[in-house]
A protein has these predicted regions:
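Membrane-interface alpha helices of multi-pass inner-membrane proteins
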Residues: 28, 131-135, 169-184, 227
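Transmembrane-helix motifs of polytopic, lipid-linked glycan transferases
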Residues: 97-117
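Transmembrane-helix signature of polytopic, membrane-embedded enzymes
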Residues: 21-22, 110-133
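Transmembrane catalytic cores of multi-pass membrane glycosyltransferases
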Residues: 52, 57, 184-197, 201-266
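Short acidic/glycine- and proline-prone juxtamembrane loop motifs at membrane-interface regions
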Residues: 138-146
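Start-transfer (signal-anchor) and selected internal transmembrane alpha helices
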Residues: 1-30
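Short hydrophobic/aromatic helix or loop-helix immediately within or flanking a transmembrane segment
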Residues: 66-93, 97
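Membrane-interface transmembrane helices that cradle and orient dolichyl/undecaprenyl
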Residues: 154-169
Length: 266
């Protein structure tokens, strides 16, 4: 079979291009759903605008009526600023654009990493599509879209580091510093790191894991943990993040934590 001309081959869309464009425009065309299915976007934009206008990040509540003066932990302040900036430039379309870009990049990285790890393109495309379908329930113009993106970047970095494809241990505390100021689910990064540490312990007990790798993994964890305190609320951020997932009332009334309801039509 004759191969196409190099220029033609370059111009023809690749599976990764189709995947990225498909996810991106699926979110863009479903823009109204991205913010109508959740009431938090207005609050995020308001807080972001306050930070942009005043140049300060409030640590005490100035937005509510009943809790004025109480401690306020803005665990999403950086993403709120980004959403506010996007809103100033493009209105609500800007916020949809940010969410769609994060979603498409997340799925693209998953696909590319699957290819790199030796999976057939068809298998990688199937898995990436499956991830897309499963995650689509959470396609909203909210800060948690940054966590989707950061989880993939974090796992990508750990996989390369664990397989000795990279020695950049600084990558993790830098990424964690951004993550911890963007969304409260930064704890997911430590959960993922924990799985690699458990695997290293198992390999070490079998005589296959090196002491140096173990030291590096624990050092990554220590440095990444240390930078989590570099945020406007300091140690209180951990209390908010851990407190939320351990709050039975909150988790029982938040869709993300509920079991799937197969009787819903939407």
């Amino acid at each position: 079979m004759k191969k196409p001309h190099p220029i033609l081959a370059y111009l023809l869309p690749q599976p990764r291009d189709i995947l990225f464009i498909g996810v991106f425009f699926s979110m863009v065309f479903g823009g109204t759903k991205l913010f109508n299915n959740d009431g938090d976007l207005g609050r995020h934009i308001t807080i972001g605008n306050y930070i942009l206008d005043t140049g300060t990040i409030p640590t005490y509540d100035i937005f509510s009526h009943t809790m004025v003066g109480e401690r306020l932990v803005l665990h999403e302040w950086l993403s709120q600023v980004i959403f506010a900036l996007a809103h100033r430039v493009m209105g609500l379309s800007g916020d949809v654009f940010i969410a769609a870009l994060l979603g498409a990049l997340t799925i693209l990285i998953v696909y590319e990493e699957l290819i790199k790890r030796g999976n057939f393109r068809l298998v990688a495309l199937f898995v990436a599509t499956l991830v897309t379908v499963v995650s689509s329930v959470h396609w909203l113009a909210r800060p948690h879209m940054f966590t989707f993106f950061f989880v993939v970047l974090w796992t990508y970095g750990l996989e390369r580091f664990y397989k000795n494809e990279s020695k950049s241990s600084w990558y993790f505390p830098v990424l964690m510093l951004i993550w911890v100021n963007t969304h409260g689910a930064f704890i997911a990064g430590f959960v993922v790191l924990g799985t690699y540490i458990v695997d290293w312990i198992w390999e070490f007990l079998q005589g296959r894991g090196s002491k140096e790798m173990g030291k590096q993994l624990f050092l990554i964890g220590l440095l990444s943990f240390a930078v989590t305190f570099i945020n406007p609320s300091g140690v209180y951020l951990w209390g908010t993040s851990v407190g939320y997932v351990s709050n039975e009332f909150m988790t029982s009334h938040t869709v993300e934590y509920l079991s799937p309801d197969f009787h819903e039509k939407d």
